[in-house]
UniProtKB/Swiss-Prot annotation:
One of its GO terms (biological process) is translation. One of its GO terms (cellular component) is cytosolic small ribosomal subunit. GO terms for molecular function: small ribosomal subunit rRNA binding; structural constituent of ribosome. Transmembrane segments: none annotated. PROSITE patterns: RIBOSOMAL_S18. Belongs to the bacterial ribosomal protein bS18 family. The keyword Oxidoreductase does not apply. Binds as a heterodimer with protein bS6 to the central domain of the 16S rRNA, where it helps stabilize the platform of the 30S subunit. This is Small ribosomal subunit protein bS18A. Keywords: Ribonucleoprotein, Ribosomal protein, RNA-binding, rRNA-binding.
Amino acid sequence: MMAVKKSRKRTAATELKKPRRNQLEALGVTTIDYKDVAVLRTFLSERGKIRSRHVTGLTPQQQRQVATAIKNAREMALLPMAGPR
């Protein structure tokens, strides 16, 4: 008699990933302002780099707004420039 193989069902990679929480919604922020340094710091790494939207869970439009606000705040010397590589 031949042994019967058990079929293993693979789970898709998308089923394993849980959806990222939108950090702006979690903070209760509706408009992004370059003067709101406390909120903008949550989107910076410890080296001062802007975090990707895959990390922050932002929409593409929100990510562009956050990036622009961070760049404006850097120009006004409210936030530090990115650190050494």
